[in-house]
Amino acid sequence: MTSEKGPSTGDPTLRRRIEPWEFDVFYDPRELRKEACLLYEIKWGMSRKIWRSSGKNTTNHVEVNFIKKFTSERDFHPSMSCSITWFLSWSPCWECSQAIREFLSRHPGVTLVIYVARLFWHMDQQNRQGLRDLVNSGVTIQIMRASEYYHCWRNFVNYPPGDEAHWPQYPPLWMMLYALELHCIILSLPPCLKISRRWQNHLTFFRLHLQNCHYQTIPPHILLATGLIHPSVAWR
């Protein structure tokens, strides 16, 4: 039975939650909103407590804002262990990827997991290399799935009373397409996902352009999961 309560007024994270409409416009994978949003969780050492908050673009990207805030507000010993999870509306650009790597090199006790709703200018070679460098540095990067969207809705959104289960359920195809392109990036393959926007009716179009190298390198079950590849396609 669905609870008739929204986030409790006694919830210490309530003032740091975003509104439902903000979550929708920032994290809908079909939208190409320019601004970025970051929802994050921090867990220190062996503590079970999780610190949650959010951030948005200012004059800097949200990733840089987080790093500045994190390093300035706490006397953080480099050897202290800390687990950080980011839920980003856009993947980091190459400059932010470099800043993240520098931050992690100065704080070897920090582990970082990044979930992204969309890939930022994924055709740009510098952005692609930046994401590969992060992965090679030990950062986990994944596309947000339904479970991550629900987690964010429950823990970061000031949803109305009774609407805990009424989180936005976006079509899984968009998530699968972005996940496929992320595989291409990590494996140093050419882009396979083309994205275009028709501004008159605000529709976003996704198109797959697979080459032989994609069929040769990407596991078949990942390609088949999109539902756009026929099982009879010959893998070489």
Curated annotation (Swiss-Prot):
Catalytic reactions of this protein: a cytidine in mRNA + H2O + H(+) = a uridine in mRNA + NH4(+); cytidine(6666) in apoB mRNA + H2O + H(+) = uridine(6666) in apoB mRNA + NH4(+)
Pfam families registered for this protein in UniProt: APOBEC4_like (PF18774)
Amino-acid positions noted as binding Zn(2+) in the UniProt annotation, renumbered to this chain: 61, 93, 96
Signal peptide: none
SUPFAM superfamilies attached to this UniProt entry: Cytidine deaminase-like
Stretches assigned to the CMP/dCMP-type deaminase domain: 10-134
Known cofactor(s): Zn(2+)
Catalytic activity, EC: 3.5.4.-, 3.5.4.36
Annotated localization: Cytoplasm; Nucleus
Keywords, in A-Z order: Cytoplasm, Hydrolase, Metal-binding, mRNA processing, Nucleus, Zinc
GO molecular function, one term: RNA binding
Record's cofactor remark: Binds 1 Zn(2+) ion per subunit.
Expressed in which tissues: Expressed exclusively in the small intestine.
A Gene Ontology BP annotation from the UniProt entry: mRNA processing
Domain of life of the organism encoding this protein: Eukaryota
Gene Ontology terms: cellular component: apolipoprotein B mRNA editing enzyme complex; cytoplasm; mRNA editing complex; nucleoplasm; nucleus
Xref: InterPro entries: APOBEC/CMP_deaminase_Zn-bd, APOBEC1, APOBEC_Cyt_Deaminase, CMP_dCMP_dom, Cytidine_deaminase-like
Active site, UniProt feature: 63 (proton donor)
Record has Phosphoprotein as a keyword: no
Xref: CDD domains: cytidine_deaminase
Family listed: Belongs to the cytidine and deoxycytidylate deaminase family.
Assembly information from the UniProt record: Homodimer. Interacts with A1CF; form an mRNA editing complex. Interacts with RBM47; form an mRNA editing complex. Found in a complex with CELF2/CUGBP2 and A1CF. Interacts with HNRPAB. Interacts with SYNCRIP.
Alphabetical list of PANTHER family matching this protein: C-U-EDITING ENZYME APOBEC-1, MRNA EDITING ENZYME
Function: Cytidine deaminase catalyzing the cytidine to uridine postranscriptional editing of a variety of mRNAs. Form complexes with cofactors that confer differential editing activity and selectivity. Responsible for the postranscriptional editing of a CAA codon for Gln to a UAA codon for stop in the apolipoprotein B mRNA. Also involved in CGA (Arg) to UGA (Stop) editing in the NF1 mRNA. May also play a role in the epigenetic regulation of gene expression by participating in DNA demethylation.
Name of this chain's protein: C->U-editing enzyme APOBEC-1
Gene source species: Homo sapiens
